[in-house]
Amino acid sequence: MLVQFAGPCRLGYYGELKDSILRDLGYEFDMLNFATVTGKPLKDYIDVCKRKINPNVSVPHGVVNMLATFKMVECLDEANDYYLANAAFEDNPGDFEHARQAYFADMRNAACEKDIVAAQKAGLERFRAIPCHKPDNPIRVGLVGEYFTAVDESSNLGVEKKLLGMGVELHHMLNMTNRNLRYNEKNLRASASDYIMYDMGPTSSMTIAATLKYAQAGFDGVIHMKSSGCTPEIDCMPVLQHISRDMHMPVPYLSYDSQTSDTGLDTRLEAFYDMLAMKKEKQR
């Protein structure tokens, strides 16, 4: 069983591509594709779930488990935020990754919300116990962009791990908690009202609002990531350029397609890091 979330742009077509690719590879499966009910009442979502998963499923029981799932999503995002902000400064390379895999194992074994809360507490305690030497003023970089490209490690060629390996503190506003569970489009646009008036598509408002927030918080830079041809994020780029000029914060733009090379990405990230390090040294 695969679950595909929907989207108002090409995100809604990802499920069709995944279905086609996996069937060409010989897999047999049922796909729960929410793109088929985008914008429809909750009842339609429930009907699709019952038809695909279990016609006899209890709706109240399903709601309880869905709420537990939402709790797990929030916990995973909280743990990931801590990991991104601190993993670059571990004394023993690999400690954070080892702790994170143990945390994921605990979450996979969780059977109810109580188990999820216990796994979260144990996981964060494990993270905080890792010996670190974090400088008082580390290089801080925010990550923004198109949902799947900016978040998925395979899609962005491991940008997060590359930057953590350079000793960079990372922040990522774009996650399921902020984009799906607690999303408020009007508040986001209001927070960046000097730069945007209207919603330009899927994650555009969050991209712009997050970039402005990072600039106002004194971040050293922001990296914008998108799949090649993603129109909403292309529309964001001139706005980000304005923010970059106004706030004196560099914003490199990474566009991914089938020809994007790992070596080329390394070169760009290393040059970006060197520039930030020299700028920070100059400001001391």
Write out the residue ranges for each language-model feature.
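An N-terminal assembly and electron-transfer interface module characteristic of large anaerobic redox
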Residues: 1-284
